[in-house]
């Protein structure tokens, strides 16, 4: 009797499998991915080696994987090669990709980039921290923010730890410069967050925490980048 029961069960399973095999294939719905503004992609000013299709694919893949932000680096000599004459071509393309993929934008318009300042456009020469540079900085960043509606944060100083490690005497000058630029931009764009960036690995490896403390109360935020392998120089 027991043998017949098992045979019957086996036949029922076989029939069920056969019926399932005859049913049309129903595609499994793709899982919904929620974009996270804290997860971003980094895009430097495009070189000629990068095609528009490659950029489109990179942005699309990033957004479908959950990225909700683009950290966009713009260099002053590229965006304003002539005074008051802006080169929007590349930036318009990148910003359209951000809009199409629902990405917020953090603008890296760094007056300081690690151990160097600038690069500035040739027409500016090499200005020091002061009123003239403050006015030009506010004017150019204002033009960029006003052109696009998706920039919600701006970084003015990048890897300050590296710069001040070489130019310790410039800390006070830059702090005054940053505060004046911050105040002017906040009057024009009160919802924009403005801050500075430090290299976490450099701060920890070289005991430069005091520079972070100098800027902890300035601006809206302090952000850290991290490269786990220390560079030789």
Language model segments and positions:
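Extracellular/periplasmic catalytic domains that process cell-envelope and extracellular macromolecules
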Residues: 33-35, 63-64, 100, 146-149, ...
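Short strand-loop junctions, especially beta-strand C-caps/beta-turns
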Residues: 44-46, 75-79, 159, 227-229
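Hydrophobic alpha-helical membrane-insertion segments, chiefly the h-region
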Residues: 14-23
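Hydrophobic faces of well-ordered beta-strands that scaffold small-molecule active sites
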Residues: 37-43, 70-72, 105-109, 154-156, ...
């Amino acid at each position: 009797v027991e043998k017949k029961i098992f045979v019957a069960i086996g036949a029922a399973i076989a029939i069920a499998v056969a019926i399932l095999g005859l049913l049309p294939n129903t595609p499994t719905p793709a899982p919904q991915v929620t974009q996270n503004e804290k997860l971003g992609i980094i895009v430097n000013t495009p070189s000629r080696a990068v095609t528009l299709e490659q950029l489109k694919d990179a942005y699309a893949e990033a957004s479908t994987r959950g990225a909700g932000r683009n950290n966009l680096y713009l260099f002053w000599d590229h965006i304003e090669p002539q005074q008051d004459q802006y080169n929007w071509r590349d930036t318009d393309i990148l910003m359209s990709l951000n809009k199409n993929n629902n990405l917020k934008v953090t603008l890296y318009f760094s007056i300081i980039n690690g151990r160097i300042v600038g690069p500035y456009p040739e027409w500016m020469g090499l200005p020091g921290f002061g009123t003239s540079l403050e006015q030009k900085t506010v004017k150019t960043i204002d033009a960029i923010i006003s052109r696009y509606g998706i920039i919600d944060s701006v970084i003015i100083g990048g890897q300050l730890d590296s710069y001040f490690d070489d130019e310790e005497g410039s800390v006070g000058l830059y702090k005054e410069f940053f505060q004046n630029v911050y105040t002017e931009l906040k009057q024009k764009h009160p919802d924009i967050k403005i801050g500075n960036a430090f290299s976490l690995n450099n701060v920890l490896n070289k005991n430069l925490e005091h520079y972070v403390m100098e800027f902890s109360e300035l601006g809206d935020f302090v952000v850290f980048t991290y490269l786990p392998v220390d560079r030789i120089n």
